[in-house]
Amino acid sequence: MSALAELLAREEGVRLLVYDDATGRPVVPGVTMVGHPTIGIGRCLDRKGITAGEALALLENDIAEVRQQVLRSLPWAARLSEARQVVLQAMAFQLGIAGLLKFTGTLAAAQRSDYAAAAAGMLDSLWARQTPARAARMAAMMRAG
């Protein structure tokens, strides 16, 4: 780390959640901002945001975490085709691992290789009613493999 980076980390502090730079309080829904939404070491999100490269780096970190969560929670999923693993990982990314695990019928069907039933279970859900196009694409991938 450069001398400047060390100095700024010390002076600004490292904050891993968005905070109001004027008050130091975390930014949460319903709280009025006084200053600027800031994260990391002084990164003002409303002034600079993040770059596409930074967004992709964050995404890759999130994907690695989701893959581990899915394999830890559903070890049998490692035997699925790559496309079907991607479906489960994408669902866990969107819904959280706890949300994915609520699809008990879908997961049981996928585990026994009944992909039509797994896809049907996906489509018969609140998730599918809330995000119908996405759910239809994911169900088609589950069916086709």
Residue locations for each model-derived region?
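Long, amphipathic alpha-helical surface segments
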Residues: M1-P26, R43-K48, A52-L56, E60-N61, ...
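Structural recognition of the beta-strand scaffold that forms the well-ordered cores
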Residues: L7, T38-G40, V87-A90, A117
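Mid-chain, well-packed structural core segment of small domains
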Residues: A77-F93, A98-L101
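Residue-level preference for alpha-helix termini and adjacent loops
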Residues: V18, T38, R79, A92-Q94, ...
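Short N-terminal mixed-charge amphipathic segments
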Residues: G30-C44
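Short, conserved, surface-exposed binding loops centered on an aromatic residue
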Residues: V28-V31, R79-L80
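Residues that flank catalytic or metal-binding motifs in active/ligand-binding sites
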Residues: L4, G35, R84
